[in-house]
A protein has these predicted regions:
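Short phosphate-binding/catalytic loops that engage adenosine nucleotides
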Residues: 79, 104, 174, 264, ...
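A cross-family glycoside hydrolase active-site/sugar-binding cleft signature
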Residues: 53-57, 83-85, 107-112, 137-139, ...
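Histidine-acidic metal/acid-base catalytic patches
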Residues: 4-28, 32-53, 60-71, 75, ...
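Active-site-adjacent beta->alpha loops and helix N-cap segments on the catalytic face
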Residues: 89-98
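Active-site mouth loops of central-metabolism enzymes
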Residues: 53-65, 110-117, 148-152
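Active-site acidic/histidine proton-transfer and metal-coordination neighborhood
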Residues: 11, 16-19, 42-44, 81, ...
Length: 294
């Protein structure tokens, strides 16, 4: 089951059972050695240290069976936070206690788009304030829904929906955004560029580096062009066989330099969907990132 189906199934289940309970959302390591450090000596003094989280969907079966234990293990690996994709039936207040006990922060969530609109928005925002995470990211590739990839007007209407959500988020001190990135064209312009051209600066651009590159997108160009909008970015390696971060095709020095100078990045979020019931791959991810000086 992919993350979109996972979140949608979780959302429908939660809505079916919700009465007085809180709303519940939505929801072989490569032998090649990491490549890093080619331009580290050239980094400017204005670059900042950015905390690293992991997207919990990477180990969602472990999180579903023991969320507190999973958070503790993630903290021991050296991660600074986690990004949620569903709450596994737990009350947000209890999750906040788990986070505090483990020493982790909430880097944000992947939240079903339906929970960011209409009468669900306020409850969604309240839960994020409980968790201490201010980034509410729609985990789908929104440019492709409702045939937006092939329709300029639909793409624009989708952007308008996010502008409304961004305005509603302001009183809560929160931000909404989209996950993924789409390099395919809408009337001659990459869908993601068209979308972010039509949205206000407060709409966050969470690029999934590997996915975006797979659609022909240029993540380096996007971070540079939409300055300050990459408050969060998914660090996922591109290449055959699902390589660990640092052993594929991504120019990580360039990504980090852009994020730390013009991207406005507040969280790096590692994601590796190679094994949902094993800590090995996300442990390898944080090890590689720390070796890169992150």
């Amino acid at each position: 089951m992919d993350r979109r189906s996972f979140l949608c199934t979780a959302a429908l289940s939660a809505l079916a059972t919700a009465t007085t309970s809180p709303l519940l959302f939505g929801q072989s390591i490569s032998q090649r050695q990491p490549i890093f450090g080619r331009r580290r000596a050239q980094r400017g003094k204005n670059q900042q240290k950015i905390p690293i989280a992991v997207q919990l969907y990477s180990v969602h079966r472990l999180a579903a069976s023991d969320l507190a234990g999973t958070l503790d293990e993630i903290a021991k690996m050296g991660y600074d936070g986690v990004e949620f994709a569903g709450y596994y039936g737990n009350d947000p207040k209890d999750i906040r206690k788990m986070l505090d006990n483990s020493g982790l922060k909430c880097a944000g969530t992947h939240t079903d788009l339906r929970d960011l609109e209409d009468d669900r928005f306020d409850r969604t925002a309240e839960i994020h304030n409980i968790l201490g995470g201010k980034l509410m990211i729609a985990p789908i590739v929104p440019y492709s829904i409702e045939n937006a990839l092939h329709d300029v007007d639909t793409n624009k209407r989708l952007a308008e929906r996010f502008n409304v959500m961004a305005e509603k988020a302001k009183p809560y001190g929160l931000f909404v955004g989209t996950h993924g990135g789409e390099g395919r064209l809408v009337d001659g312009i990459p869908a993601s560029e068209r979308f972010f051209n039509d949205t206000v600066p407060e709409v966050v651009m969470q690029i999934d580096i590997a996915y975006f590159m797979s659609t022909g997108g240029d993540p380096y160009k996007m971070i540079e062009k939409y300055k300050g909008r990459s408050k969060t970015i998914h660090l996922k390696e591109s290449g055959r066989g699902g390589p660990i971060i640092g052993s594929g095709n991504v120019d990580w020095d360039r990504i980090f330099s852009l994020c730390e100078t013009v991207g406005g990045t507040e969280w790096y979020v590692a994601e590796d969907e190679g094994s949902a019931d094993d800590f090995g791959r996300i442990a390898a991810c944080i090890k590689a990132l720390r070796a890169m000086g992150k």
